[in-house]
Amino acid sequence: MKGRSLNTEDRARLEAAIGYRFAEKERLDRALTHSSARSGRAINYQRLEFLGDRVLGLCVAELLFQTFTDANEGELSVRLNQLVSAESCAKVADELSLHEFIRTGSDVKKITGKHMMNVRADVVESLIAAIYLDGGLDAARRFVLEHWTHRAASADGARRDAKTELQEWAHAKFGVAPKYRTDDRSGPDHDPRFTVTVEVDGIAPETGVDRSKRGAEQVAAMKLLEREGVWQKRSAGN
């Protein structure tokens, strides 16, 4: 959807899909507006995304704390990182068909492929913030629980920390320690993307991308463990 605001029919369809009716319709419009759609720092979803990331983290952390009463802090952190990742948020966006409503500008071609996944994830966080501002924490929590409760139940929390697992596996199999290299940092300060490569002597490296350097290291370690058959690869539905 290039440029234009939601019409009455589209707004009703989207509000029905997300299960929330906005009192201030402009909040929903802003949550769907990519920075390419208009000039001006206050018209797009970037500020909402910043807030929505924190609201999502709080609601999911609360869900995990109440659900997995015997899990320690490390196990809860692994689950949390899985559930609030860009990949998970993008899947929620796909379930809601948010791509049909995202407002973009003339440089829409710049947000295709992997970056488009990040855009879909960002819009979900922006939408959570818009709901929070419009209806309060309870409304935002209801949305998060609707779309993350089943994901929390299926998240592979039995896994250990990927970097720790890779460290022990690499030492036992090759007698070496993994080496991590930061290849790239992109994106604005409030929403960076780190690309990290992990190398273990004797086998091909793997690369991970995440919003934090540590998260990217975890993704790279996880991908290497899955590729080498140390961990079973997660299904696409989780």
UniProtKB/Swiss-Prot annotation:
The keyword RNA-binding applies. This is Ribonuclease 3. One of its GO terms (biological process) is tRNA processing. Mg(2+) binds at residues 49, 122, 125. InterPro entries: dsRBD_dom (IPR014720), RNase_III (IPR011907), RNase_III_dom (IPR000999), RNase_III_sf (IPR036389). SUPFAM superfamilies: dsRNA-binding domain-like, RNase III domain-like. Homodimer. Residues 161-230 form the DRBM domain. It is found in: Cytoplasm. Residues 11-136 form the RNase III domain. GO terms for molecular function: double-stranded RNA binding; metal ion binding; ribonuclease III activity; rRNA binding. It comes from the Bacteria. Its main location: cytoplasm. The lineage of its organism: Bacteria, Pseudomonadati, Pseudomonadota, Alphaproteobacteria, Hyphomicrobiales. Belongs to the ribonuclease III family. The active site is at residues 53, 125. Keywords: Cytoplasm, Endonuclease, Hydrolase, Magnesium, Metal-binding, mRNA processing, Nuclease, RNA-binding, rRNA processing, rRNA-binding, tRNA processing. It catalyses: Endonucleolytic cleavage to 5'-phosphomonoester. HAMAP family: RNase_III. Digests double-stranded RNA. Involved in the processing of primary rRNA transcript to yield the immediate precursors to the large and small rRNAs (23S and 16S). Processes some mRNAs, and tRNAs when they are encoded in the rRNA operon. Processes pre-crRNA and tracrRNA of type II CRISPR loci if present in the organism. It is an enzyme of class 3 (hydrolase). GO terms for cellular component: cytoplasm. Its cofactor is Mg(2+). It holds the Pfam family Ribonucleas_3_3. It comes from Rhizobium meliloti (strain 1021) (Ensifer meliloti). The keyword Magnesium applies. Its EC number is 3.1.26.3.
